[in-house]
Amino acid sequence: NTVGTKSYRRYQNSGVSGTLANVSVMESKIGDQLNITLRDEDGNYVKNQFSLYDQNGFVENNFCEDIISKLRNMKKGETYTIYTWLLSPEDQRSYDEDTAGREVRAKYYDRRGVSIKSNGERVDNYIKFETDDRPYVEGGNISPRIKWVENKAKPGKKKKSAASSEKRSDFFITELMEAVNGH
């Protein structure tokens, strides 16, 4: 409300479920937002909102790339459950140590993403990520990979190439606009 005395936000620790009503991009004071609107079993509309861009102006790669990758495999009117997740460095290291054949790395970082299920089954990515065996092709459903370059300000360190970040971001925005047209 305008007075700020009542919050309409509800935090869901076990995911948000409902029938897919709409997917849209909305401008706001805090930047463009990717909105996925579900209609719950009580008929209430539940808006799941994610910042579309990171602080560098590229598509946010924790949640939005993940969501956009799945949109073309989602249909309006079907029921979905949306979960956000966080995998801590400690959990990743523990998993690698406990799993045969996994290499334990020197350093781990937080990993975040979104899982979407329909009827208990995972919604697969429509967009695949570029690998050595699966190259990026203009107009296809393979996203271009980020290229890492030497950081001249910090010798011995690498940073993301701005050109490859922009190319990847443009790919995801184009894909989002095409997917949203169907919602």
Question: What is the predicted role of each segment?
Answer:
Residues 1-55, 59-72, 88-153, 159, ...:
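OB-fold ssDNA-binding interfaces and closely related basic DNA-contact patches used
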